[in-house]
Amino acid sequence: MTPRPGIEPAPLPSVVVLISGRGSNLRAIVESTPPCRIAAVISNRPDAGGLAFAHANGIATEVVDHTAYADAADPRGAFDAALMQAIDRHQPQLVVLAGFMRILTAGFVDHYTGRMINIHPSLLPAYPGLHTHRRALEDGVRLHGCTVHFVTSTLDNGPIVVQAAVAVDADDSEDTLSARVLEQEHRLYPQAVRWFAEGRLRIDGARVRVLPPPDADTVAAANDRALVAPALDR
Ligand code: GRF
């Protein structure tokens, strides 16, 4: 049968995920089956636990070891250049930093403006940097949480896509608080990747607008025309 023109499905947007460690956010994203193709998982550490998960799930993995560039004239620049090459071989629409523990050069960040996101374990702009849970406990804050944001050249800064806040309990330890925040990270990051893949994020200065799904009106109108129990999602 001659294939009919015009019915090829659009290719899924491609995503590269950068990790340094256990990769629980990577796992949450993969298991959410987002409408994108995870083209590769790249780690700066050969022993990152998330690499085994990616490999077991048939995702290409690569290591760009930052220690290999320690003797370069500009170690940070040389590492970022190698990382950029490794990423760009996959021509991703989106770069996802999922526990990627490296400070990136401005040139690297600029190259991915509007198409690189990060998850940070605090309610930004509070507590950029490391040890966020410990610092929140030391300050006695009652609300703590996590943030998904577009990456800019200022550390843990950039237009915020989504945040979740959790209450801090009087007897919380760093471990109990980080576990509750991580649970929220695993809800937020897959959703943010899905929004991006669906083309629903618009950066407007410091703010991000999340556009409604294209069929939102149709679903609402269909719901108005009938009583359906239990309610349909779409
Ligand atoms: C997460 O808490 C993330 O917010 C932070 O690093 C941690 C990474 O955890 N940037 P995992 O590797 O995704 O399990």
Task: Please describe what each predicted stretch is.
Residues 1-234:
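One-carbon transfer enzymes
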